[in-house]
Swiss-Prot record:
This is Zinc finger protein 271. It is found in: Nucleus. A zinc finger (C2H2-type) spans 78-100, 104-126, 132-154, 160-182, 188-210, 216-238, 244-266, 272-294, 300-322, 328-350, 356-378, 384-406, 412-434, 440-462, 468-490, 496-518, 524-545, 551-573. May act to control gene activity during the pachytene stage of meiotic prophase. May function as a transcription activator.
């Protein structure tokens, strides 16, 4: 018996004995199989129906063995020219060969594909064709698989469940990514550094840090972004879109992450606890910043002056001291600011808005930070401690200023003279000595002041307000500094000692005046050449030149240049009354 292969097409192979064919890869019909066995028995010299059962089985087995031999031989006929892999069928070889070449090319962009189906899907990018519409909403999709995934948004179906924690997902890819949380698997490694990622998209985004690639451009301002999600968020600045609304207070946000953080104000949730102390935070970024208080880490260094910071945002703000950049202008006046928060706070001067009320008293504040600071008056909390002397403070800024007493640091130099200051606010106040600027004007008498605190004190002259009361004698004062000085009358405290003699003073200004006796310094000089050690003496002397007599007598109208002269004069009227 001789069985041979014959071919009718590239993809269909037949076994043949010259008369009957059996198609390989498909079940043979009963007629074909009977005919094939019949042919074998005819060649052996007897008819099929006369062959005993055992003999027929033997013939069939022999036929099967020869078939297997022929098929093994046939498998060796489909070899890949590129890599020497062998295939049983030509279709397998054809599919394999497409791993070496891509025969289906897009006429629009030249991109090539291994499969015609992949080309069809790709061409829909150019044509915009989306033949799979959702029956629930107006969305359409270019692939049926995308439609199936989308429909789970409407049905809520989550057929892919995690065996570890029971969490369910609408897509198998999401489950696979989630499972890497449990396994710790990070199969996508950066070729530039040692970082690995659980998602391919995470690695692609990370690679743009190294390459600097920003493929997503805003068509309003031409700003570029490394991630499409960042572009979408940015575009909401132009459109004003705020699609994420708080269901408690109705406040809307341009980003879902901002809404999540906002909702924690209502819930009080602080899911990020510090392992070093008992503080918790509503944001992970706040916890990371807070930890640096414990570790002392300051990873952000200024390239201009070498100063280091524990937050990148603080470094950016600091660098604007060097550059002078003030990118936030006020649309109500000519002022500009280096920080957005400073602009927002400033604009409340124009609007009068005070959105932060104290729950303990009736006070309201234009800044949240001012409310937090104020609230510590009620609680007595002083969370910031000096590691040099143990003194505690209710505000971190006060601790920083205090620490400069120990370090002697004065980081704010005046560019008009040689003076330096430990506080930026002190430098600003000092610079007004050089510029003569007096930006704070009284709305009752139009008098102007270089400092807001001086205006506040002055306005109490008009209002008669004396908010600072002495606990010993109930005397009231307009200024807290006056109350402190007054307290020393009761306590006898004289904290300012002269280094040249044993005298002490209750006021620093009195010590400075006294020290001029020892040094001979007379800093107040008149145009006539005469000099004085005290400002008050200089003022009195100038009245000789100006003729000013600001102290009039209420009885006779006579005026005097000195108050003491008026007091002496008034005694004349008092004596006259006694004589009468």
């Amino acid at each position: 018996m001789e069985i041979q292969f014959s071919y009718e097409s590239q993809d269909h192979h037949f076994l043949s004995d010259g008369e009957t064919k059996i198609k390989i890869g498909e079940p043979a019909t009963e007629e074909e199989m009977t005919g094939k066995i019949g042919t074998v028995t005819e060649e052996s010299g007897s008819l099929e129906e006369d062959v005993p059962h055992d003999s027929r089985g033997k013939e069939f087995r022999e036929f099967g063995e020869e078939l297997n031999d022929q098929m093994l031989f046939r498998r060796r006929q489909y070899n890949c020219d590129e890599c020497d892999q062998s295939f049983a069928w030509s279709t397998g070889l054809i599919r394999h060969q497409r791993t070496h070449w891509k025969p289906y090319e897009c006429e629009e962009c030249g991109k090539a594909f291994r499969m015609s189906s992949a080309l069809v899907l790709h061409q829909r990018i150019h044509t915009g064709e989306k033949p799979y519409p959702c029956s629930w909403c107006i969305k359409s999709f270019s692939r049926s698989s995308d439609l199936i995934k989308h429909q789970r948004v409407h049905t809520g179906e989550k057929p892919y469940k995690c065996d570890e924690c029971g969490k369910a997902f609408s897509q198998s890819s999401d489950l696979m990514i989630h499972q890497r949380i449990h396994t710790g698997e990070k199969p996508y490694q950066c070729s530039h550094c040692s970082k690995s990622f659980s998602q391919h998209s995470g690695m692609v985004k990370h690679l743009r840090i190294h390459t600097g690639e920003k493929p997503y451009m805003c068509n309003h301002c031409y700003k570029h972004f490394s991630q499409s999600s960042d572009l979408i968020k940015h575009q909401r600045i132009h459109t004003g879109e705020k699609p994420y609304k708080c269901d408690v207070c109705g406040k809307a946000f341009s980003q879902s992450s901002d809404r999540i953080l906002h909702q924690r104000i209502h819930t009080g949730e602080k899911p990020y606890p510090c392992a070093q102390c008992n503080k918790s935070f509503s944001q992970n970024s706040d916890l990371i910043k807070h930890r640096r208080i414990h570790t002392g880490e300051k990873p952000y260094k200024c390239s201009e002056c070498g100063k280091a910071f524990n937050q990148s945002s603080v470094l950016i703000l600091h660098q604007r001291i060097h550059t002078g950049e003030k990118p936030y202008p006020c649309n109500q006046c000519t002022k500009s600011f280096s920080r957005l928060s400073d602009l927002i706070n400033h604009q409340r001067i124009h609007t009068g808005e005070k959105p932060y009320p104290c729950s303990q008293c009736s006070k309201m504040f234009s800044r949240r930070s001012d409310l937090v600071k104020h609230y510590r008056i009620h609680t007595g909390e002083k969370p910031y401690e000096c590691d040099k002397c143990g003194k505690t403070f209710s505000q971190s800024s006060n601790l920083i200023l205090h620490q400069r007493i120990h370090t002697g640091e004065k980081p704010y130099p005046c560019n008009s003279c040689s003076k330096s200051f430990s506080r930026g606010s002190d430098l600003i106040k000092h610079q007004r000595v050089h510029t003569g600027e007096k930006p704070y004007t009284c709305n009752l008498c139009s008098k102007s002041f270089s400092q807001s605190s001086d205006l506040t004190k002055h306005q109490r002259v008009h209002s008669g307000e004396k908010p600072y009361h002495c606990s010993s004698c109930n005397k009231a004062f307009r200024q807290s500094s006056d109350l402190i000085l007054h307290h020393r009358v009761h306590t006898g405290e004289r904290p300012y000692a002269c280094t040249q003699c044993p005298r002490s003073f209750s006021q620093k200004s009195d010590l400075i005046k006294h020290q001029r006796i020892h040094t001979g310094e007379k800093p107040y000089k008149c145009m006539c050449g005469k000099a004085f050690s005290q400002c008050s003496a200089f003022t009195l002397h100038q009245r000789i030149h100006t003729g000013e007599k600001p102290y009039p007598c209420a009885q006779c109208g006579k005026s005097f240049s000195q108050r003491s002269d008026l007091v002496n004069h008034q005694r004349v009227h008092a004596d006259q009354k006694l004589q009468m």
